[in-house]
Structure formats: C-alpha cells, structure tokens
C-alpha cells in the first residue's frame, strides 16, 4: 500500500515537472520568434506581425503573432517614405546594417548630403549622424571630408573626362594677375581667383595648371615681340606687296639673260684691267731677289716675247686666275719667279 501510494505521488510530481519544463520551453520559443529580426530583402514579401493567434501546446495554449503577407513595394515605401529618391530609378537596391536603403553605384541624394553637413555643423558626431540617418559611417566621413576640402556636397564624377577649368576668361585673369605682380606665386593666383569669385572650389585650376598657363603666356609674349630688323625691310606692308606684281614669265627670262650678260662683260673688263696692270714693266728690280738671268743682269726680256705672252694671256683671260697666281705673267719669265719691288724715285742704283 505504501509503495503504491509513493509511486503514484512520484508519477504525479514527475508529470507536473515535465509539464512545467515543456511550458517553459514553449514560452522561450514564442519569445524568440517574436523578437527575431527578419532579414530585409526588398524583392521578397515581408511578414507583418499583427494580431495574436492561439496555438495548442502540451501544457495549454500559447499566443503567437499572426503572420500577414505584405507586398514588396508597399513595404519599401513604408520603410523609407512614399517618395524616396533612391528608389525612383528602379535600380538594384539594398539595405545596410543600420536599416537604410541604398542603390548600388548611385550616390546619395543631395538632400541627404546637405542634411549630413548641416548636422555636422551643429556639432553632431559622425557616428550619431550615421545612426540617425541610417547611412554608413564611411559614407558620412567621405561626404564630410569632401565638403571640408572642396566646399561642395555634390558627388564626384564617375568615369569620363573632367570639365575644362582653363576657360579663356580664367586664362586672361591669370595673365592679368601676373602682369600686375610678376612675383606672384601660383597658389596665390589660385587663391585670388577664388576670392574674386572668378572660380569656385570645384572648378578652380590647380597649381600645376596655373604654372603651365603662365609659361605658355610668356612664350607667346616673346613670339609677339618684334625683332631687331627694321619692320619696313623685314616685313613689307601688305599694300606694297600687292602693288608689286611679278612680271610675266617671258620678261623674267629676258631679265635673267641680260643680267648674266652684264656679269660676263664686267668679268671680262676686270680681266683686261688685270692684264694691263701686268704689262706695265717695273723700273728696277733688286739684284739677288730673282732667279732668272734677266733679273741678275738687270736687263729686260725681248719685247716680242712679252707681246706673245701677253697676247696669249689676253685671249685666255678667263682662265688665267686658275693657271697662274695673281701678279705673275708667264712660267719662264723673271716677273713670275719672284715678287717685284718698286723702289723710290730718289734711288740711285746702289744698295
């Protein structure tokens, strides 16, 4: 009797303990299911947790939330608002760890960028900005760094060529600054362009670009300076060049022929004058300075010999400078062997 009563009591206590354990397990499962954060994916339906539904368990009934399917577009609009510029183009969207929606390959809208800068100016830390706006910390830091360096919140250009910053107006302003102050540095010119509101932080030329513009301007100025030659001689006026028309082709040939004939006649006259100067015989030659017998004896060669040689020279006057040196007459004559010296008039014939 005692054993049966003890066994009944033991079974009752064991059943109650098992039921309590099962109830505790069911409650923990319900708590985990209610607190679990679902993975966000805008391309699949979401489950909305609405009114509770009772589910039977071993220990009794447990209330669980009711599952309701929501369309993806409605869920996305309810997540970030009905008018989200990130979702307007229909690109591939994603959700970061903070729950913010982003589009791959697209920068943040200007409104969010301006809001980031405004919150930073009010003293909000970047980490707090990241949590409040649901934007990654790296994106916030990059936007603020770009704003502090360039003064602009607009995103950079992805691909393509940069816009031209050295416009004609900017080039002329740089040249004017350099003419006004030749010792001005390139970084001072860059700062001056920003102060005069000729350029902004986005389109101001770099220091290397300004140096290149200054070098090109100085080179062009050197080319523009006139040379030492008289301008009227070096560069005749256009009116003069137009008035001086070239003669016809036949007239040009005739003029060239006449010019060549005149040059030939002048050369012949010069040769004849050279021969006549050689015909004039010297008054006396210094003894011992010549190597011919005529020079040693103080006599002159026969006149017929001189006439023959001068006749040959006159007929071949054009080639005389190539055969004999200047001032010489013939190969076997005393005048060709040695140089001649003209003595003064008061010379009496003795050395």
UniProtKB/Swiss-Prot annotation:
It is found in: Nucleus; Chromosome. Residues 226-258 are annotated as: Disordered. Keywords: Chromosome, Developmental protein, DNA-binding, Nucleus, Paired box, Transcription, Transcription regulation. The keyword DNA-binding applies. It comes from the Eukaryota. One of its GO terms (biological process) is positive regulation of transcription by RNA polymerase II. The keyword Heme does not apply. Residues 94-150 are annotated as: PAI subdomain. Residues 169-217 are annotated as: RED subdomain. It holds the Pfam family PAX. Its main location: nucleus. GO terms for molecular function: DNA-binding transcription factor activity, RNA polymerase II-specific; RNA polymerase II cis-regulatory region sequence-specific DNA binding. Residues 91-217 bind DNA. InterPro entries: Homeodomain-like_sf (IPR009057), PAIRED_DNA-bd_dom (IPR043182), Paired_dom (IPR001523), PAX_fam (IPR043565), WH-like_DNA-bd_sf (IPR036388). Transcription factor. Involved in negatively modulating apoptosis in germline and somatic cells, acting in partial redundancy with transcription factor egl-38/PAX5, probably by directly regulating transcription of apoptosis regulator ced-9. May bind to the DNA sequence motif 5'-GTAACG-3' in regulatory elements. This is Paired box protein 2 homolog. It comes from Caenorhabditis elegans.
